């Protein structure tokens, strides 16, 4: 980064509203948080599955947003979709199953993200709604995701 670009970056970070920046949660911290929220064994999945899912959906970034071709968007560390689970005011045909505004899934507190992800997993009886989990985690040795934590 050029030296001239650093002050601009600092100014942009300073004017961004608190809670909207998102953070990268370190892997072992995420493991602890997920265990505290009862995800070990929830719908038959291990915490390692949830950590793998978060790694491949958002790279552990609580502020991640992905825009989809159908006009919906995916939000937060678990990339929760606006068509089915959260309200963003723009997605056509949305059902808002978690009854939460999508912006709440972008802050540094992932308690509401976990609550919504648990609802999704409970309704699906597993993690199959997440493409990244199906493609990168299902049926694989996921011990490295929790090793040392």
Feature-to-residue mapping (PLM):
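Export/targeting segments at the very N-terminus of extracytoplasmic proteins
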Residues: 2-61
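Catalytic and binding regions of secreted/periplasmic enzymes and modules that target cell-wall glycans
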Residues: 23, 67-149
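A near-ubiquitous, low-amplitude feature marking generic local secondary-structure context
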Residues: 33-37, 63, 93, 99-100
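Conserved helix-loop-beta core of C-type lectin(-like) domains
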Residues: 47-55, 60-81
